[in-house]
Amino acid sequence: MPTISQLIRKGREVLTEKSTAPALKECPQKRGVCTRVYTTTPKKPNSALRKVARVRLTNGVEVTAYIPGIGHNLQEHSVVLVRGGRVKDLPGVRYHIVRGALDTAGTQNRNQGRSKYGTKRPKKGAATAAKGPVKGKK
């Protein structure tokens, strides 16, 4: 505990908050080009093949970004939009690719949480036809 005279001489040091997505340089999103698209395995209790991409951002920084949703159309040289947000079971993956923006297509056949996966609102007639026949009616 400092004395009053020590506080007068030095003052309190203000704690600076460390950014969770430093490569974005305080921007909400950044554009980038995929340099490599591949799958990787998660940390210990989990088991899967997670889809990730190595992206070179417009500021020259190269980051690893997660591709959310089922299926994607990304390949090398695809232009993508990158936002912050880490993937807990993938070490070193601190960014997400935004679905439905630039070269990234939205996820198909999605009815809930569509805004997170860039899926357009289904047509009125198409939604019931896609579900199949209604049980109980002949």
From Swiss-Prot:
Residues 105-114 have a biased composition (Polar residues). Residues 101-138 are annotated as: Disordered. One of its GO terms (cellular component) is small ribosomal subunit. Keywords: Methylation, Ribonucleoprotein, Ribosomal protein, RNA-binding, rRNA-binding, tRNA-binding. The modification 3-methylthioaspartic acid is found at residue 89. Gene3D superfamilies: Nucleic acid-binding proteins. The keyword RNA-binding applies. One of its GO terms (molecular function) is structural constituent of ribosome. InterPro entries: NA-bd_OB-fold, Ribosomal_uS12, Ribosomal_uS12_bac. SUPFAM superfamilies: Nucleic acid-binding proteins (SSF50249). The keyword Nucleotide-binding does not apply. One of its GO terms (biological process) is translation. It holds the Pfam family Ribosom_S12_S23. Residues 125-138 have a biased composition (Low complexity). Part of the 30S ribosomal subunit. Contacts proteins S8 and S17. May interact with IF1 in the 30S initiation complex. Belongs to the universal ribosomal protein uS12 family. With S4 and S5 plays an important role in translational accuracy. Interacts with and stabilizes bases of the 16S rRNA that are involved in tRNA selection in the A site and with the mRNA backbone. Located at the interface of the 30S and 50S subunits, it traverses the body of the 30S subunit contacting proteins on the other side and probably holding the rRNA structure together. The combined cluster of proteins S8, S12 and S17 appears to hold together the shoulder and platform of the 30S subunit. This is Small ribosomal subunit protein uS12. It comes from Heliobacterium modesticaldum (strain ATCC 51547 / Ice1).
